[in-house]
Design a protein with these regions (language model features):
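Conserved donor-binding/catalytic core segment of Leloir-type glycosyltransferases
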Residues: 230-252, 259
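N-terminal subdomain of nucleotide-sugar transferases
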Residues: 1-66, 182, 265, 270
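A conserved catalytic-core segment of Leloir-type glycosyltransferases
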Residues: 2-3, 40-105
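Nucleotide-activated donor-binding/catalytic signature segment of Leloir-type glycosyltransferases, i.e.
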Residues: 275-284, 290-314
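Donor nucleotide-sugar binding/catalytic pocket of nucleotide-sugar-dependent glycosyltransferases
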Residues: 43, 143, 163-235
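Acceptor-binding helix/loop patch of EC 2.4 sugar-transfer enzymes
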Residues: 12, 72-84, 101-105, 129-170
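An aromatic- and histidine-rich active-site surface loop
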Residues: 83-94, 109-130, 136-146
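Acidic donor-binding loop of glycosyltransferase active sites
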Residues: 181, 307-310, 321-339
């Protein structure tokens, strides 16, 4: 029997980290064995993540999955110098541990997923040193609207830091992308835009790999019998529509369309509109309880804020999943970004 091919998956974010970037490797790596690949995940030590950890999410990772962790520079040391990005803080540790693994063991491919983006630069460096082909995986564009039309300034406008980040991405992305043997992305538009920005990139293969879904998450949720009835009341005869996720400035026009439709429904059938409740969770993408509301102010513009509730702080993953399970309907909103 042919031995499985081996892939080193580099993902700075991984459970118990609770950020959105943790799910790409979490969902992908456990299923690679079904397709003839034996994965090893290289990630960051939980002590070096910022924000709250999600131990329940960590419990959902299959025990058979090999996970190697390395230290990153502590944020308390680097932030006074303006560096908080996990990819930068962990770059040295990821390089050191990846080099150690590639020296001692055989790997047939390297899979680096971004965000954060800077670890993508490990691809060309490790390929040059060890001759291992690498795949660059995009969860989001490296060079997108951040620093161009949106940023960390007031009202979500671009500021100096977001513009600097975009400038760095425009200079660094070609170095990584041109060396990539394969390019994958959550959408075809994402990798096509990246290749369009870098005409000299000639990957041997490209593929669209949506974030996807794992039935095991629902089975895990049911086994734990988690309930969030205080967040989504049941048996009250109301129509509970839930949105769980970040609400970016580029998504506000979509939300305005939703609120305008709810306002119009109130004009046409006030009794039906009175039964509708829109619930928003995690809109700020921050863990802190003091994060500012983003959905309620928009609802107020259309006079439907009495039908809207919002919890800006992020929920733990399985809490958010239970909230979606408890909902009458789930609201999925995109943004104005073409990818």
């Amino acid at each position: 029997m042919k031995p499985p091919r081996r892939v080193l998956v580099v993902s700075p974010h991984f459970p118990p980290d609770s950020s959105a970037g943790t799910h790409r490797a979490r969902l992908l790596a456990p299923h690679l064995g079904e397709h003839g690949w034996e994965p090893t995940v290289l990630t960051v030590d939980p002590r070096d993540y910022e924000g709250a950890l999600d131990p329940v999410l960590a419990e959902s990772v299959p025990a058979a999955l090999r996970v190697i962790r390395t230290r990153a520079w502590p944020a308390r040391v680097t932030r006074p110098f303006g560096v908080g990005d996990l990819g930068l803080r962990a770059f040295e540790g990821l390089w050191r541990e990846a080099s150690h693994l590639l020296t001692r063991e055989r790997f047939d491919a390297l899979f680096i997923t971004i965000y954060p983006a800077y670890p993508a630069l490990l691809g060309p460096l490790l390929k040059r040193r060890f001759g291992v082909p690498f795949v660059l995986d995009y969860q989001d564009p490296w060079v997108g609207e951040w620093g161009h039309s949106v940023g960390g300034g007031s009202n979500g406008r671009p500021d100096v830091r977001s513009r600097a980040s975009r400038f760095a991405g425009m200079r660094l992305e070609p170095f990584a992308l041109r060396a990539a043997d394969g390019v994958t992305a959550v959408s075809e538009a994402t990798y096509r835009q990246a290749l369009g920005r870098n005409n000299h990139a000639r990957p041997a293969a490209v593929a669209e790999l949506p974030i996807g879904w794992d039935d095991g998450d629902i089975a895990f949720l049911r086994a734990r019998r988690q309930r969030l009835s205080p967040l989504i009341p049941g048996g009250d005869g109301l129509i509970h529509i839930v949105y769980a996720g970040t609400l970016l400035p580029t998504g506000l026009e979509t939300l305005r369309a939703v609120c305008a439709a709810l306002g119009r429904l109130r004009e046409l059938d006030s009794a039906l509109a009175g039964r509708v409740r829109l619930h928003f969770f995690g809109t700020s993408n921050q863990r802190s309880a003091g994060a500012a509301s983003r959905a309620v102010p928009v609802a107020r513009e259309f006079g439907v804020d009495d039908l809207v509730t919002e919890q800006p702080a992020r929920l733990d993953y399985f809490d958010a999943l239970q909230t979606l399970v408890d909902a009458t309907a789930v609201l999925l909103m995109g943004s104005s970004e073409p990818h």
